[in-house]
């Protein structure tokens, strides 16, 4: 019974998806009803997940319940909380956007919860087949949401490109899984880990090749070089709020499984991947920076910059290191976890606020559309500035703390050159992020615009404001709100440490 309780957050989301699917069959339920129902299920699931936080350093493998294909521990619960919170914030931030797009129907919100269900299962997956099924549930839900408005040719092109490339790269995962099974006679990660620890180098060839093919699948999903070609077109073609969801929450789900596999099961392969990941990191940082600098559409600029943030996260991964049978720098795993929190808030806030601004229009969201925003809507301009400062890694924001954490651990592991390149990419990022800030504050507003006072009572505005507050408190929380533990930077870091350390308790 206790094992079942740990599944309640995931099952709540699944039940919610099914209920919303049936609700969509009846015309009497409007968009507001679907948003409300979705929010209720998400809040219930979040409360159940938060209730499990007290079970720190716990590992509950479902050996008798689900044949050990899922694992519950503080690590998976950490990601459950992030994924549910990210989905809930996406829903609330996009509330105004959803209501002003007639093509959004009730079944869309069911698909959104199915995507979350797949992500949560992925975060708890303890077996390669289970992980693949969870990944595909989430991915196909995302495909549908990307191309939800079939009347828009850009979205049709985006979903076709994403679907074809995603299906193609999924074959790499399957091939890699077959090779791993051929070598180890198992797809359970615990069995694969045992084989890696005891086998000689000659027997490891198939395992290395198979796991590398699986690595390519995840590099595609997080849009690392050279698998980033789909990102700009797909992000541009997708509805703005779905772009926000893909750039933040979905990316976190991918990293959740990737990090679990590296830390808990196949850490020796980090040494084998060292050269591959080093090259990928350099090219991801350089190419992502070049793309971001050359964009004229804000949506594409933010999309390109997300490639750069992928490079930062991969830098923290490679900094884990492996020598003499153990990880060299476990603190780097804490850096990954903290940076994921920082990136979730910053990226979701920036993309979500852009969707909020254009919710009543159909513009492409170029830099010109933000001219004089500080005069037109000063409150929204201030919040966008906070998110951009955090993405750029400017002090007093959570993004700054995250970057410092990642760069410090990378240097400690001996990756000084990669860190220097990452710092240079950060310096260049100041240009394209501050370019948007300059447009908002130093360019004249259109002649026909009127200044709006802060009397916006929409749910979206308050949700964005909440994320902006967290972004600032995550950067200076220890200094100004030390008496509120939940707002303390050290609390977030400790939460990350507990999540990682639970993987090593058996």
Swiss-Prot record:
GO cellular component: plasma membrane
Major localisation: membrane
Enzyme Commission number(s) of this protein: 7.1.1.-
GO molecular function list: NADH dehydrogenase (ubiquinone) activity; NADH:ubiquinone reductase (non-electrogenic) activity; quinone binding
Top-level taxon of the source organism: Bacteria
Membrane topology, record value: Multi-pass membrane protein
InterPro entries (UniProt xref): NADH-Q_OxRdtase_suN/2 (IPR010096), ND/Mrp_TM (IPR001750)
Top EC class for this record: translocase
Alphabetical GO biological process terms: ATP synthesis coupled electron transport
Catalytic activity: a quinone + NADH + 5 H(+)(in) = a quinol + NAD(+) + 4 H(+)(out)
Keyword Glycoprotein annotated: no
Residues annotated as transmembrane: 4-24, 34-54, 78-98, 103-123, 128-148, 163-183, 205-225, 239-259, 272-292, 301-321, 333-353, 381-401, 410-430, 464-484
UniProt keywords, alphabetically: Cell inner membrane, Cell membrane, Membrane, NAD, Quinone, Translocase, Transmembrane, Transmembrane helix, Transport, Ubiquinone
Subcellular location(s) per record: Cell inner membrane
Family, as annotated: Belongs to the complex I subunit 2 family.
HAMAP family assigned: NDH1_NuoN_1
Subunit details: NDH-1 is composed of 14 different subunits. Subunits NuoA, H, J, K, L, M, N constitute the membrane sector of the complex.
Matches recorded under PANTHER family: NADH DEHYDROGENASE
Free-text function comment from the UniProt entry: NDH-1 shuttles electrons from NADH, via FMN and iron-sulfur (Fe-S) centers, to quinones in the respiratory chain. The immediate electron acceptor for the enzyme in this species is believed to be ubiquinone. Couples the redox reaction to proton translocation (for every two electrons transferred, four hydrogen ions are translocated across the cytoplasmic membrane), and thus conserves the redox energy in a proton gradient.
UniProt-recorded name of the protein: NADH-quinone oxidoreductase subunit N
Provenance organism: Aliarcobacter butzleri (strain RM4018)
């Amino acid at each position: 019974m206790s094992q079942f309780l740990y599944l309640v957050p995931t099952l709540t989301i699944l039940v919610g998806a099914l209920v919303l699917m049936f609700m969509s069959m009846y015309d009497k339920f409007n968009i507001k009803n679907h948003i409300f129902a979705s929010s209720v299920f998400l809040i219930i699931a979040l409360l159940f997940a938060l209730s499990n936080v007290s079970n720190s350093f716990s590992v509950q493998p479902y050996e008798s319940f689900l044949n050990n294909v899922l694992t519950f521990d503080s690590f998976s619960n950490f990601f459950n909380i992030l994924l549910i919170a990210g989905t809930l914030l996406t829903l609330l931030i996009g509330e105004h956007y959803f209501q002003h797009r007639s093509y959004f129907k009730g079944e869309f919100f069911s698909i959104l919860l199915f995507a979350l269900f797949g992500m949560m299962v992925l975060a708890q997956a303890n077996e390669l087949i289970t992980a693949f099924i969870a990944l595909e549930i989430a991915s196909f839900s995302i495909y549908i949401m990307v191309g939800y408005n079939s009347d828009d040719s850009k979205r049709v092109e985006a979903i076709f490109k994403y679907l074809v490339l995603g299906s193609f790269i999924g074959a790499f995962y399957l091939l890699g899984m077959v090779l791993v099974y051929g070598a180890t006679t198992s797809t359970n990660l615990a069995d694969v880990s045992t084989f890696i620890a005891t086998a000689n180098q000659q027997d490891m060839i198939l395992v290395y090749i198979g796991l590398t093919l699986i690595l390519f699948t995840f590099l595609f999903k997080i849009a690392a070089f050279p698998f980033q070609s789909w990102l700009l077109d797909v992000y541009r073609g997708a509805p703005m709020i779905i772009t926000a969801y893909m750039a933040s929450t979905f990316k976190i789900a991918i990293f959740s499984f990737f990090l679990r596999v590296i830390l808990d099961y196949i850490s020796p392969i980090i040494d084998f991947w060292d050269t591959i990941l080093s090259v990928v990191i350099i090219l991801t940082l350089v190419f992502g920076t070049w793309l971001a600098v050359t964009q004229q559409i804000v949506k594409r600029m933010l999309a390109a910059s997300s490639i750069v943030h992928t490079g930062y996260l991969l830098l923290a991964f490679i900094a884990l290191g492996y020598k003499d049978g153990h990880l060299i720098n476990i603190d780097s795993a804490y850096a990954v976890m903290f940076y994921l929190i920082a990136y979730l808030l910053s990226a979701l806030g920036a993309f979500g606020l852009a969707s909020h601004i254009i919710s009543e229009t159909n513009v492409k969201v170029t830099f010109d559309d933000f001219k004089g925003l500080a005069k037109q809507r000063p409150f929204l301009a201030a919040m966008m500035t906070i998110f951009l400062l955090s993405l750029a890694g400017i002090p007093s924001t959570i993004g700054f703390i995250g970057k410092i954490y990642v760069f410090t651990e990378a240097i400690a592991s001996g990756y000084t050159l990669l860190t220097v390149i990452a710092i240079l990419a950060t310096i260049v990022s100041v240009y394209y992020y501050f370019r948007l800030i300059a447009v908002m504050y130093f360019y004249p507003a259109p002649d026909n615009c009127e200044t709006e006072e802060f009397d916006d009572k929409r749910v979206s505005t308050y949700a964005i404001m909440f994320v902006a507050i967290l972004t600032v408190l995550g950067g200076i929380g220890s200094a100004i709100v030390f008496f509120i533990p939940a707002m303390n930077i050290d609390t977030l870091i400790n939460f990350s440490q507990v999540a990682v350390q639970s993987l090593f308790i058996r």
